């Protein structure tokens, strides 16, 4: 089996690329970073530090790399069996034209063996969004062929891969946590279902997408925002602060109550999942900066994301949400010189006041009780 993976960054190398290569799949990375491309093509291998209770070093080998802009990547799309991405939600639109060109070439070469494309991004149904961009870039006469022969498979991914400086200045070395979860929608594949250790197949993807969004992402963001306010440097420092831990755990329990109502998750198993996530935040090997985790607060405060979406669920089912409100208020306080969204958030609050600003960002009704609760919590933090 041959695969092309867009994005040779830390998540690409440390998570998806590693699983594919470990499964014996012939893997090529596509990226724009020439230093990384040159290193991959010189060595065809790299090291991954897997850290949890213990630390181990795995070597990923037999990999190649091409530029994601150029003819090589188009040629590969015409030949491979699987295309995966870990490029970040914003970049999906930028890689779509190259994918479209590759699919046209595949059609021209009469390659009708099934191709499956899986976007492994921190977003809900990212592959469906990528498909929209690819379809827009395709000529009309290729669209029906692509619908017939190409599967666009949505997935939920979960593994913390913090940026970490290599002790050896090796541009390929990467550190990842032991935990990893890659859940894919088995109803969207073309052809036979792949057997890749570490890839879990489900016919109820949204339950797992929301479980991760409402637990890991919600908890991570609130830890970062409260941690930043309290002057902590890392996620570990923040979650070891008992006051912060109580709010984060409470928020995950509130969002968990929504999941249990909506999808029928087992309450005891979900409580154990929350404990596992708190343990991941404490991982001493992951020097995960609160500023990195908190960045892009406008996106994180939008209606479909990790703070507002679970809050809307609590309103839908008439459930408590005090800790989620605390997290939202802390997010409104997020300031970072390196993050344009943090600056935009500050300007919006200064210009319109917290009530109108939160309503504009989140889509919540400015006159609603929850916005009033969030504004009260926001002011109490000043």
From Swiss-Prot:
Listed name of the protein? Mannitol-1-phosphate 5-dehydrogenase
Per its UniProt entry, which superkingdom is the organism in?
Bacteria
Pfam families (UniProt xref): Mannitol_dh, Mannitol_dh_C
User: What family does this belong to?
Assistant: Belongs to the mannitol dehydrogenase family.
Which lineage ranks, top first, belong to the organism behind this chain? Bacteria, Pseudomonadati, Pseudomonadota, Gammaproteobacteria, Enterobacterales
InterPro entries listed in its UniProt record: 6-PGluconate_DH-like_C_sf (IPR008927), 6PGD_dom2 (IPR013328), Mannitol_1_phos_5_DH (IPR023028), Mannitol_DH (IPR000669), Mannitol_DH_C (IPR013118), Mannitol_DH_CS (IPR023027), Mannitol_DH_N (IPR013131), NAD(P)-bd_dom_sf (IPR036291)
* GO process annotations (BP): mannitol catabolic process
Quote the record's binding site residues for NAD(+): 3-14
Q: What species is this protein from?
A: Escherichia coli O9:H4 (strain HS)
The record's annotation in PANTHER family points to: ALTRONATE OXIDOREDUCTASE-RELATED, MANNITOL-1-PHOSPHATE 5-DEHYDROGENASE
Q: Its encoding gene is what? A: mtlD
Catalytic function, reaction form: D-mannitol 1-phosphate + NAD(+) = beta-D-fructose 6-phosphate + NADH + H(+)
């Amino acid at each position: 089996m041959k695969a092309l993976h867009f994005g040779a960054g830390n998540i690409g190398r440390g998570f998806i690329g590693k699983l594919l290569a470990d499964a014996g799949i012939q893997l090529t990375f596509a990226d724009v970073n020439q230093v990384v491309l040159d290193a991959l093509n010189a060595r065809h291998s790299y090291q991954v530090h897997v850290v949890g209770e213990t630390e181990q070093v795995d070597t990923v080998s037999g990999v190649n790399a091409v530029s994601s802009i150029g003819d090589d990547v188009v040629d590969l799309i015409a030949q491979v069996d699987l295309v995966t991405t870990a490029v970040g939600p914003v970049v999906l639109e930028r890689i779509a034209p190259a994918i479209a060109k590759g699919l046209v070439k595949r059609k021209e070469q009469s390659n009708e063996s099934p191709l499956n494309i899986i976007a492994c991004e921190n977003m809900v149904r990212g592959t469906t969004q990528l498909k929209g961009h690819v379809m827009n870039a395709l000529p009309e006469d290729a669209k029906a062929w692509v619908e017939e022969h190409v599967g666009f498979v949505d997935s939920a991914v979960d593994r913390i891969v913090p940026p970490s400086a290599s002790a050896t200045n090796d541009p390929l070395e990467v550190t990842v946590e032991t935990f990893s979860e890659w859940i894919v929608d088995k109803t969207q594949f073309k052809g036979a279902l792949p057997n890749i250790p570490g890839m879990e197949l489900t016919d109820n993807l949204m339950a797992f997408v929301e479980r991760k969004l409402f637990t890991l992402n919600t908890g991570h963001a609130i830890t970062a925002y409260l941690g930043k306010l309290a002057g902590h440097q890392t996620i570990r420092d923040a979650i070891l602060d008992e006051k912060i831990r109580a709010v984060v755990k409470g928020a995950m329990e509130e969002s968990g109550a929504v999941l249990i109502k909506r999808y029928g998750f087992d309450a005891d198993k979900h409580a154990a999942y929350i404990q596992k996530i708190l343990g991941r935040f404490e991982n001493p090997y992951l020097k995960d900066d609160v500023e990195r985790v908190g960045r892009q607060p406008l996106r994180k405060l939008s209606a479909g994301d990790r703070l507002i979406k679970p809050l809307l669920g609590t309103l839908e089912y008439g459930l408590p949400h005090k800790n989620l409100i605390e997290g939202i208020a802390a997010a409104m306080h997020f300031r970072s010189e390196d993050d344009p969204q943090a600056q935009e958030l500050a300007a919006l609050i200064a210009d319109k006041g917290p009530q109108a600003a939160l309503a504009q960002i989140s889509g919540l009704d400015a006159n609603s009780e929850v916005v009033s609760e969030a504004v009260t919590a926001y002011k109490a933090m000043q």
